[in-house]
């Protein structure tokens, strides 16, 4: 096992340190330029669409645009937003934060494209809901069913099973450290609560995340604001340090400027998931009048994840001054030490509570992606979905009590392949998202407040099964 873990880790180092960074950043820049900075010029529209979607009621089993946004944010905003950012600062220096911001800006364009495509090629269900994602547009638009099936299997295993076990493991370790609670007890509680949420189906998951995500992110950002206000005199110096170290040859341990850039880009990509092919699964479920609406909303999710939540961790760590570049104190422990310097002995419990919210929301969001891709195989029997739910609950229990280094490395490997497959698809299908964007803007320029999508504007209607058509 140790040999296998070493081999997988070496492959991951090459894949995530070089290949994927080049492809993800390159495609992000391409989408940014070709959409004429859609993530910047339509930022007010993103905010309008998101705020208009809050509290929107949908009929039957349909999912609102805000609920779909909350599901994807639940998956995005996980333990990595606390531990990952702390690790980035220790290994890449404060300058890594700047490069996380940059990659988030670029990734917004990629997120827009993949989510818009997911909406264009979504499939309707008899109960009035929708489902879709990369597996669906790979099959229906690229007409490569074999690749689509492989993608569906990989994302179901990676997100639905492996990532759920990793998040459960983090919750159990945090509870044991802060409250001396046995991992077995934590496993039992997690199994029960996970079952209650996921067995209620897509609509219950959407309602659960719609309730939890704003509270979860809001509380954490509030803590960061309190610390920022308490250290307001240090803020100009902190921002100057971030900018200076982002371009300083001595910025980080073991690689200087290159290390700062590489670390920031890697952590940014891991956190916001733009281009990885996960978020489109949630985007496709939204009931909207135009695909671009959900593309813009999901694009804004990248800002929320990195510019708000990840920045909150960065400010907490940098303003409290508990970090040492290249030091042993890192990850969750560094976040706890940073909060303890402000709030005292209450900090471990507070961090444990935040981890519980972040990690459990990720479990629910990750399961959601798995369920959507299980549905891709169109089995009339519910046995497959029942088995998948049972496996998810089992992996939550297993993850709470296991060492998961090999499992985590395998998940990263699978995610790398998912990412490359999705980028291949969205680059080839980009013209459809671009035409949809132009259609949306033309209607807005004519004074139409809520544009309606007409698939006839696309170069081809092949593979579209919603939007009033059903063509092969």
Task: Provide a role label for each language-model segment.
Residues 37-64, 87-89, 93-97, 109-142, ...:
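Flexible loop linkers connecting adjacent transmembrane helices
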Residues 23-30, 34-47, 169-175, 181-231, ...:
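Membrane-interface loop-to-helix entry segments
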Residues 57-91, 117-135, 139, 256-303:
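Alpha-helical membrane segments and immediately flanking helix-loop junctions
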Residues 27-32, 103-128, 134-198, 354-363:
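Helix-loop-helix module between adjacent transmembrane segments
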Residues 1-79, 89-96, 428-472:
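N-terminal alpha-helical transmembrane segments of multi-pass membrane transport
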Residues 4, 34-39, 80-85, 161-172, ...:
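Transmembrane helix-loop junctions in multi-pass membrane proteins
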Residues 9-48, 90-128, 304-312, 413-423:
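Extracellular loop-to-transmembrane helix junctions
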Residues 114-122, 223-241, 249, 255, ...:
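Extracellular/periplasmic helix-exit of transmembrane alpha-helices
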